[in-house]
């Protein structure tokens, strides 16, 4: 499929499915210390508790929202114009950037001057690229280390708290039982955080201190002012990344923009554009201009295209030009496989699956062809100079990650991890933000060792892992094999999880696969937050459990990660609208619903003047008679 044939800029349009608010949800904005700090959240309204169960009010809950303006009915979305430059004023008022007269990248200038690309080109960008003034450093880490709390830091502090205080106050205001409701629905289990330092409330100062220490990053390139600030770090909510991108086999620019908007609708905190096909530069421009979340790339992929796929022909000059090209477009973080050293390559010879990272294999081939260390390693300090001029964060790539559980935690993988730790300290010397990429394929009992060694070697820089996949026997289900490992390593301290779709190892994911991967990983990340005891993490669980106990079916659907699928599954069995208010579910029917029985036992206890234990015994006698009369079947059709 040729992207030029499939896509014309004049015909570009937003995916209508991505701009509809989710059921019973509305976009709200929590204002910060200045009017232009407006932090988006999703408010999910709930029905009142039925009179039979007390008839109380259930105030709305607030959900972390990555969807940007797309789910705001008040926003006018035209992907040919791109999103508003939310951060432009914040960037300008710091006084440390300059607008360039032209693109600095030779390749970027070539693309801009090519009239054959006019019909493909994003038409809505009318500003010049920015770069730090001479001698300046514009990274969030640099500001943090100087004691400056930026608007971006305040923004993420508000975002991380999820309006929890307002929710608790709204519970207290529901009536005479309000304080008790606040106590019950705000309660959560004490977690096990494995040495993390998660405060009860996230403050802007805490955000600043974590970034200054290197334990967290805010990936916000100065040339991506459309992005809504978010934070990646062990002491914050676990984030997820979605991969998109075309290949030589297919996919158009329109399709990739739709994958991005679809990813963020369902909860993608960042998106990586891994395009390897035609028109990579133009595809990336469309994605960045329309993305409210950070965009990451693997620059070596595009550099390889520039030398017609011959790894040995790559040079530092080509790679450097690619970094600048992408930085001036607004890429927020680069995966750079600088830890693939010549001495590590022979260590992979006895592996079952060799080197499976594309970037890792490219650099291994270059090292062997030239018999010297890669230019990514030898020019690392020069790369740091580029990164801090645009505030691009490093995602130090694990080019030697294991591609099978057979190869997990071997000397090549762990040797590279030590080198990534050394490179982290060099980047930090330049006040450049860093996250560390991790595996891969690792059985469950070996996962914690990965986390412990990463914390040790990389001095608590945020860990970003692909899964890991915990078994290799389930092609078509690797979103599940990896979701297991993702939940575990997220609990142990990983800051961001890279999603895996059902198509992993099999083909390019479509929109349905993207959604399946996102939902699986949102679930894994949330399970990790619960296990760590992240303050407020259990609020949504408690609200949904209360709705389930009170048979508020619509609230159960709407409070879930995927309201559409929950409603679809329920309606397959009970399609009538009356079933949405039924006091039983589609599995056990009206006579044997455990929650209905519990409700009846409580009512019975009140009527008989018994405590619940005595009522339970007597009530079960009554239920046993009903069971026999109904035919003595464990499950019944309705």
Curated annotation (Swiss-Prot):
- Which GO MF term does the entry hold, naming one? carbon-carbon lyase activity
Q: Check the record and name the InterPro entries matching this protein.
A: ThiC, ThiC-associated_dom, ThiC/Bza_core_dom, ThiC/BzaA/B
Question: What does the sequence similarity comment in the record state about its family?
Answer: Belongs to the ThiC family.
Q: Which GO terms describe its biological process?
A: thiamine biosynthetic process; thiamine diphosphate biosynthetic process
Q: Which PANTHER family match?
A: PHOSPHOMETHYLPYRIMIDINE SYNTHASE, CHLOROPLASTIC, THIAMINE BIOSYNTHESIS PROTEIN THIC
Subunit relationships: Homodimer.
**Cofactor(s) recorded in Swiss-Prot or TrEMBL:** [4Fe-4S] cluster
Top EC class, one word: lyase
Q: Which reaction does it catalyse?
A: 5-amino-1-(5-phospho-beta-D-ribosyl)imidazole + S-adenosyl-L-methionine = 4-amino-2-methyl-5-(phosphooxymethyl)pyrimidine + CO + 5'-deoxyadenosine + formate + L-methionine + 3 H(+)
Q: What is its EC number?
A: 4.1.99.17
Q: Please state the pathway this protein functions in, per its UniProt record.
A: Cofactor biosynthesis; thiamine diphosphate biosynthesis
> Gene encoding this polypeptide?
thiC
Q: What is the lineage of its organism?
A: Bacteria, Pseudomonadati, Pseudomonadota, Betaproteobacteria, Rhodocyclales
Protein name listed in UniProt: Phosphomethylpyrimidine synthase
Q: Which domain of life is it from?
A: Bacteria
Cite the binding residues for [4Fe-4S] cluster.
Answer: 585, 588, 593
